[in-house]
Amino acid sequence: MARYFILAAALLLTACSSTSKKPIADDPFYAPVYPEAPPTKIAATGSIYQDSQAASLYSDIRAHKVGDIITIVLKEATQAKKSAGNQIKKGSDLSLDPIYAGGSNVSIGGVPLDLRYKDSMNTKRESDADQSNSLDGSISANVMQVLNNGNLVVRGEKWISINNGDEFIRVTGIVRSQDIKPDNTIDSTRMANARIQYSGTGTFADAQKVGWLSQFFMSDWWPF
């Protein structure tokens, strides 16, 4: 019987534990795009200057086609605060003085009987939650797709190896070409459908994870 109990408890704890997919550095989803450039035919004019390889001093260096690189300046700050409270009061009062039965007062030893009942209940609950996060930095991403309206789908990642672990930043979203600054940068707050992930792997990242037993006590399966 004890073995079945241990097996059932193990299955329950396994179901309560959450498993997360471990990120990999070479995820194909974030792989850069290398556009295929058509071969250029250079006419033999005998001159050192070639018009096909010339660059204008007034050309726009902002990303506008698939494979171009754009720098995303991370300026994320979120703050959330929530408070809730409720109070329930209930009371009842009953009094019978004196008690009548059969058209006369009920008494014991000549002393009339009376009934008095009073009940009250007061329940008060309060809860507060406060959370704030900020992320500053920059990451260069690739233009993965140019939409019909001219918007650019950008995506990229950056991995940094530090001591016994790796830290990474991943970003994907949609930007307007009009929002790109002349230095080919754009603020992350100007991205639509943005997905920004900053995390890490290794010893230090594992030390911040909650154990399976603690997850059980914080889950809905814990009855108390």
UniProtKB/Swiss-Prot annotation:
Keywords linked to the UniProt accession? Bacterial flagellum, Cell outer membrane, Lipoprotein, Membrane, Palmitate, Signal
GO CC terms for this protein? bacterial-type flagellum basal body, distal rod, L ring; cell outer membrane
Q: Which InterPro entries match?
A: Flag_Lring
Q: In its keyword annotation, does this UniProt entry include Ubl conjugation?
A: no
Q: Which molecular-function annotations from GO does this UniProt entry contain?
A: cytoskeletal motor activity
Query: Which residues carry the S-diacylglycerol cysteine lipidation?
Result: 16
Q: How does it sit in the membrane?
A: Lipid-anchor
* Compartment(s) of residence: Cell outer membrane; Bacterial flagellum basal body
- Per the record, the domain of life is Bacteria
Lipid attachment residues per UniProt (N-palmitoyl cysteine): 16
Q: Which GO terms describe its biological process?
A: bacterial-type flagellum-dependent cell motility
Instruction: Please provide an example of a Pfam family that matches this protein in its UniProt record.
Output: FlgH
Matching PANTHER family: FLAGELLAR L-RING PROTEIN
Q: What does this protein do?
A: Assembles around the rod to form the L-ring and probably protects the motor/basal body from shearing forces during rotation.
Q: What is the protein's given name?
A: Flagellar L-ring protein
In which organism is this protein found? Shewanella sp. (strain MR-4)
Instruction: Tell me the classification of the organism that encodes this protein.
Output: Bacteria, Pseudomonadati, Pseudomonadota, Gammaproteobacteria, Alteromonadales
